[in-house]
Design a protein with these regions (language model features):
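Conserved active-site-proximal phosphate/metal-binding subdomains
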Residues: 1-135
Length: 135
């Protein structure tokens, strides 16, 4: 059996009930985002990052296509700008960008961290049992 050394779960835990992001942001992502709703920003700066493809991300993509300087997009991609959206105004289309993985489309509800971990463990145990019974 091949195994992973680790997994990146930031997108999943972003949509946990314990995450301090505004509930409206988490609910929007859970109900509206699909795996096709991502784009890669900052490629022209050798810092490729997958983001939720909304209005601000599209502005950044357009500016990058015009060979902009980082200063031209800094305000859009700054963590402080995203914090305003996450914790103050919830304006997904007009404030900052959201770093997510393509798995965003597989998440359709906000649940507790405990439920996320239990679900992963259950899936792991089922996989191990499946391997054991196939030998």
């Amino acid at each position: 059996m091949l195994g992973a050394q680790g997994v990146y779960l930031g997108t999943r835990f972003l949509e946990s009930s314990e995450c301090p992001v505004l509930p409206a942001v988490k609910e929007h992502l859970a109900k509206s985002a699909t795996e096709m709703d991502t784009c890669v920003l900052l490629r022209s700066f050798k810092n490729s990052t997958r983001m939720y493809n909304r209005a601000v991300a599209k502005k950044v993509l357009a500016k990058e296509a015009e060979k902009c300087k980082f200063e031209d997009i800094r305000e859009y991609v700054a963590g402080s700008t995203a914090c305003k959206m996450f914790f103050e105004n919830g304006d997904i289309d007009g404030t900052g960008v959201i770093c997510v993985g393509e798995t965003i489309g597989l998440i359709d509800e906000v649940v507790t961290c405990e439920e996320i971990i239990n679900s992963m463990m259950d899936e792991c145990l089922r996989s191990i049992e499946g391997i054991a019974t196939s030998n």
